[in-house]
C-alpha cells in the first residue's frame, strides 16, 4: 500500500490541475502588476514568479509540464493577435519605414552587446568563486601539512 502511494505522488498532475496552477500564477502576477510603480507586463512577472516557484520547489515541474509543453508547441497561434496588430498598423509603419528598420537594427545590436557584457560578468564572477574555493582548499591542506 505504501508503494502505491509513492507512485501516485510521483505521477504528473492532471491537465486541468496544471491549467489551474498556471492560471493562479498569472492571476497573482496580474495583481502584482497593478501594484508595481514601473510598467511591466503581467506575463513577464508571471514567468519570473513561476521560475521562482519551480526553483524553490513550491511548484513541482510535473504540476505544469504538460500544459507548458502544449502551450510551447502551439506558440504560433498565440502570436496571431500580434501579427494582426502589425497589419493594422501598416499605415504608421509606411510613414517612416527606414526609421523603423534602423531602430530595429540598432536595438538588436545594443541587445547583443548588453547580453555579451552580462555574460562576461557572470563568467568572471563564476570563475572567481570557483577559484576561491580551490585556493581555500589548498590553504587548508597546507595548514594541515604544517601541523
From Swiss-Prot:
An annotated GO cellular component of this protein is: plasma membrane
**According to the record, what induces this protein's expression?**
Regulated by the two-component system LytR/LytS.
Q: Which residues form a coiled coil?
A: none
Q: How does it sit in the membrane?
A: Multi-pass membrane protein
| Residues making up the signal peptide according to the UniProt record | none
So where does this one cross the membrane? 13-32, 42-64, 71-93, 97-119
What is one Gene Ontology biological process annotated in the Swiss-Prot or TrEMBL record? cytolysis
Record function comment: Inhibits the expression or activity of extracellular murein hydrolases by interacting, possibly with LrgB, with the holin-like proteins CidA and/or CidB. The LrgAB and CidAB proteins may affect the proton motive force of the membrane. Increases tolerance to penicillin possibly by inhibiting the formation of the CidAB holin-like complexes within the membrane, thus reducing penicillin-induced lethality. Possibly plays a role in programmed cell death (PCD), triggering PCD in response to penicillin, and possibly other antibiotics, and environmental stresses.
UniProt lists the family membership as follows: Belongs to the CidA/LrgA family. LrgA subfamily.
Task: Give the protein name, as stated in the record.
Answer: Antiholin-like protein LrgA
Amino acid at each position: 500500500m505504501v508503494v502505491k502511494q509513492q507512485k501516485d505522488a510521483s505521477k504528473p498532475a492532471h491537465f486541468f490541475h496544471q491549467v489551474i496552477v498556471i492560471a493562479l500564477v498569472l492571476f497573482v502576477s496580474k495583481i502584482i502588476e497593478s501594484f508595481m510603480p514601473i510598467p511591466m507586463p503581467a506575463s513577464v512577472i508571471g514567468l519570473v514568479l513561476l521560475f521562482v516557484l519551480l526553483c524553490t520547489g513550491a511548484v513541482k515541474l510535473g504540476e505544469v509540464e504538460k500544459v507548458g509543453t502544449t502551450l510551447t508547441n502551439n506558440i504560433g497561434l498565440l502570436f496571431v493577435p500580434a501579427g494582426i496588430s502589425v497589419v493594422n498598423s501598416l499605415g504608421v509603419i509606411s510613414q517612416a519605414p527606414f526609421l523603423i528598420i534602423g531602430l530595429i537594427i540598432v536595438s538588436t545590436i545594443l541587445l547583443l552587446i548588453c547580453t555579451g557584457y552580462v555574460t562576461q560578468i557572470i563568467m568572471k564572477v563564476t570563475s572567481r568563486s570557483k577559484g576561491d574555493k580551490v585556493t581555500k582548499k589548498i590553504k587548508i591542506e597546507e595548514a594541515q601539512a604544517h601541523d
